[in-house]
Amino acid sequence: MKGYSSKEIIKILLEDGWFEYSSATGSHHSFKHHTKKGRVVVPHPRKDLPIGTVKNIAKQAQIELI
C-alpha cells in the first residue's frame, strides 16, 4: 500500500459519497455516508499519514485502497 496524505484520503472519501458532517475546528475532519454505517475521522492536515491509520480509515469507510 502506498502512502497517502490526508488531502488525498479526504478526496477519495468525497468521491465515494462521504460528506463532512461537522465543521472542522480542530485537527480532525469527520465524515458520514448516506448508506454506509458509522463515521470516519481523518486527521488533517497531515502530509503523510501512517500506513496503519490509512488502513483503519479504509476499513471504517468500507473502501479498498491500492
Segments (PLM) and residue ranges:
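Basic nucleic-acid-binding interfaces
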Residues: 1-66
